Amino acid sequence: MSKLSLFGLFGLVIRRDLLLAMRRRADVLTTLVFFVMVVSLFPLGVGPEMDMLRKMAPGVVWVAALLASMLSLGRMFSADYLDGTLEQMLLAPQSLSMLVLGKIVAHWMLSGLPLVLIAPVLGLQFDMPAQALWVLILVLLLGTPILSMIGAIGAALTLGLRGGGVLVSLLVLPLCIPVLIFGTGAVEAVNTGMTIVPHVALLGALLLLALVFTPWVTAQALRISME
């Protein structure tokens, strides 16, 4: 591991996690199927009230994305913890924060990116206009990585604990509320003819802050959990 550059190891962590995920495709599909089912149930329950569906759409999609992301958080570090890979990462001469960031990126590519791609199709069920769909894609691209980064902290803190999945949700959900507010606010702003700039700017700022701080915090949480 010491012969690899920092960014080379970062890419290796991403490729490794993606390859392992392809061997467990059911885990990846579970998140996507859950997201599709939750979003699709609302139009069936509400009925053909298009005005109501358009108003509900941003909140429904974001809440479903948040809950779907919770499903896969427990798997972010558990396999590496069980097979000893995590111990090797802790002992590696390279920055643990960078290795953690690689795992977060891989987690987002497997759980967040598919939601971003399928969300516009699901938005058609709510009769969302084209402009609102584009904004939905934009805010999901900004917001879902934040969910993965915040979730990584919770996953690291509850690593190896019984009932860790429930604890992760209790830790992570309150921290994700700002993302939920700004993400839904941007789409609602389009529907009401207002500017989306403040919402998008705040989401971008949250993304940058999370990118700077969460890998380091997650790395420290992993060290504590492994002691």
Show the residue positions of the predicted features:
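Aromatic- and glycine-rich beta-strand/loop motifs that create alpha-glucan
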Residues: 1-31
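Hydrophobic alpha-helical transmembrane segments of multi-pass membrane transport/permease proteins
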Residues: 25-47, 63-65, 171, 175-182, ...
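Membrane-interfacial helix-loop-helix connectors in multipass membrane proteins
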Residues: 45-56, 120-141, 159, 186-202, ...
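Long, hydrophobic alpha-helical segments
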Residues: 57-73
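Transmembrane helix boundary and interhelical loop/hinge segments in multi-pass membrane proteins
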Residues: 70-92
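Hydrophobic alpha-helical transmembrane segments that constitute the membrane-spanning cores
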Residues: 101-126, 146, 150, 183-184
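A structural motif at transmembrane helix-loop-helix junctions in multipass membrane proteins
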Residues: 134, 139-173, 223-227
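Junction motif at the cytosolic side of a transmembrane helix
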Residues: 211-227
